[in-house]
């Protein structure tokens, strides 16, 4: 039997998602059924990044030791990464791009940049050792892996020689230096980023691997955006 709190939450959700309400629902037909979707949600994460960072502008977003980045600065760095991935690293729409590193400002910016470039951010477990990293990379067919030095070293130690190119980054360095292997010194002003839809791949997360080798499970931009807006509604 639902509790009083459950009933109150259900009523509030119904009010928020009713026709004409701020989070009114629409239907998206997929898998043979109509799925409820928040109508005002943007079509892709690239749109949401742009909107959210513009809304918060100079507000402090990332704090890492003495390093501080506002929403505006973070978005500018992600945009630069995205354009560099397209122009300098030949990232194509739908390419699986691995991210293998510890928590750091660079991780956030690379994740945003990969999605904005049209790539599918493939999130490799930072606890994995070399053989596990190599297996994950090959399982999803990643064309490029952005790794901090310890994870790059783990791949080197097992003699990784797969199809993916590894770019090692010093994520402990200041941001400009940390991401220099990505964006270099090239003029990126002429790069046009792809216009993404909800059907484009956004991320790959790996299963726990508790009963076998971890396997990559993908989510589209629509799924990630709607998951975010479901959280907002709740």
List the model feature ranges, each with a label.
Residues 70-72, 202-229:
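Conserved AMP-binding A3 loop
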Residues 150-198:
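ANL superfamily adenylate-forming
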Residues 57, 186-206, 213:
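Conserved pre-ATP/AMP-binding loop-to-beta segment of ANL
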Residues 2-20, 39-61:
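A short N-terminal helical cap/helix-turn-helix that marks the beginning
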Residues 97, 114, 145, 201, ...:
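Conserved S/T- and glycine-rich ATP-binding loop of Class I adenylate-forming
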Residues 128-157, 227-234:
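Conserved ATP-dependent adenylate/AMP-binding module captured primarily in the ANL superfamily
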